[in-house]
Amino acid sequence: MYKMIVCDLDETLMNDDGTLSEKNAAAIQAAAAKGVYFVPNSGRSYTSFQNDLETMGLRDQPHQYSISYNGGLILENKDNRPLAVNAMPYEVAKGVFAAGIANQQAATHVYTQDTLYIYNPVPSDSDYLQNRGVTFTTMTTPDFEQFKTMNVMKIIMALPTMTDRKQMRADVEAIVDPSKLAVTYSSDRYVEFNPAGVDKGTAAVQLGKLLGITADEIIAAGDNSNDLPMLKAVGLPVSVANGIDAVKAAAKYVTVADNNHDALAEVINKFIL
């Protein structure tokens, strides 16, 4: 019996326009009523999906949980109480940032524990964030010292092509020892840098242990490469129909529906209800 679902948000649970369907929300509520945890497991900040938690009936609820920043932060939804903080070492973050701002095409995102800062925001990326209710502070200076006393959870760059994103990875790894980094790609626009050993999969298992749930009792659903670690870590890995080929290959179940047609409701109805 499955006791927890960990689920990516963008392009998995959410429609392409960033909204949560009524059918998905109702299925999540039905799963919760059966005692099954539904845990958003997102690369985004927890602050950006509070309204969606409200729709799910999970906002500010005790004994309900969320994972943000590709595993960087595990929270209890009640008062957004941190259970685990997996931040980047300052010098690692500083090196990643330096590579990002050297590329004038890139919008470089710095996620602290509570706030998103962007250096060189670009219109297409800003529109994408706005559609998902993501707020950010524009950096007016490239001075990274301002983050010295903060928890930097991850740094990502928005770039238009995969070739650009792979070159950015190479540029970062020319400055920062690759063994200190976990690197993924998401949303057909981002290359993402977390500290080594921190990903959606380790966080899902970590939360499971806190709740007395084994990996075999967890369902994970996703669509993109930053979801692969959680699919590989759990008992039932699921790809939505619009998932990339690598995610579909890692899945034991591929939904008939895509993210715009209630794929998560399909999963919950098939395996939980």
Task: Please provide the spans of the model-predicted regions.
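Mg2+-dependent phosphoryl-transfer enzymes with acidic/Ser/Thr/Gly-rich catalytic loops
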Residues: M1-M4, S21, E192-L273
